[in-house]
Amino acid sequence: MLFPLMLCGISELRAEQPEGASIEFSTKVIELGELSQSDDKQIIRLTYKNIGDVPLVVLEVRTSCSCTDVQFKRDRVLPGERGVINITMDPSKAPVGSFFRVLQVVSTSTEGVERITLKAEIIE
């Protein structure tokens, strides 16, 4: 009688675990603070982890302006492993004032597209 109850618990446990690749970022909002347009380019190392149960591939990272550039590898990231997206933000190409840009990370995860926000205050 106890054995069927134990099996019910196992099936419930399996239902809670993710199926497929799932991506988890070190942060989804990157605060750069106050930057002058004459400041050097800002290099940001954004890490992510595959918290799913199959390999994950970052397919594309879309930027919303010419002041940001990204570099990443389209390698398979195995479950439990980490990957990196390098973001370069050039303050000289950003407009003066509040800076708010969204990067779209397209991957093979069950989430599909994730958004990463860059924030700064740009001064002359």
Locations of regions flagged by a protein language model:
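Beta-sheet-dominated interaction scaffolds and their linkers
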Residues: 13-51, 122-124
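Bacterial N-terminal signal peptides
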Residues: 1-8
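Short, hydrophobic beta-strand segments
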Residues: 85-93
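Terminal connector regions
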Residues: 95-123
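Surface-exposed binding patches on compact interaction domains or structured appendages
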Residues: 53-84
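Buried hydrophobic-core signal for structured, non-transmembrane domains
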Residues: 44-50, 87, 101-106, 118
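Short, solvent-exposed loop/turn segments enriched in Ser/Thr/Gly
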Residues: 38-45, 94-102
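Short, acidic/polar linear motifs in exposed loop/turn regions
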Residues: 51-54, 93, 109
